[in-house]
Amino acid sequence: NHVNCGGINVVLTPGRYNSAYYEHSYLAKEADARLATSADLEVEGGKLYFKNYNGQKIRVGAVYRRLDDDFLDPLEFRGDSLIGVAGITSAYRAGNVAIMNAIGNGVADDKGIYYFVPKMIRYYLGEEPILKNAPTYLPYYDEDKKYVFENMEKLVIKDVAEAGGYGVMFGSKMSREEIANLKNIISEEPRRFIAQELIEFYDIECLIDGKLAPRKSDFRAYVIKGESIRLFNGGLTRYALEAGNYLVNSSQGGGFKDTWIVGEPK
């Protein structure tokens, strides 16, 4: 409401077939906002409107979008986008609608940032990181590139612009031809990739087709910042549905469960 340009608040979702649609619905409900797809929105006279079920148009003052930049506005970015809103960028430029997560503000989603996080902690805080990153290499630097090329068979290579488990390549599962081709691509676009040591995920027992079976999993912890900072006694466990698969992302078919730590903290 502090940045609303006049009108209702909207959570823009790609639609019910998106793997995180339930989350989008929950966010809209908790934020007292309308959940909308591109079909529900229209730009007219440089302003954004929500089209109600009875045909009424309601002015939109702020949008929290749950889709990538490329798909946001087919007039500005990908012309084949069916989930974006034509003209929303122009309305934003004119100051007629606020986009809470503005275009281009996802710099921290760039996987290349992983490489610099420990360095940022040392530079800005003068401290050593308490939690270690997975050893990360940026082939933009010659020394890292040399190591990546010599050890690609045991590394995980990631396209920095991708998310949700897309653009992740396991050197151990690639053929010699695929590795040679990837090296050529990295040589042409070294800033586009990072490489990481493979971290062995913990196996948890999952109920698959009525039987317990091990699946790779990871755990996401949450830090709560209020008057003080504390670690939440729980988190989110994500797990792969296929045996031996390391991709636990929901967009890759992975599952997730709330996880609670029972007992008093020591």
Give the location of each predicted region.
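Domain-scale recognition of functional cores that engage charged ligands
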Residues: 1-266
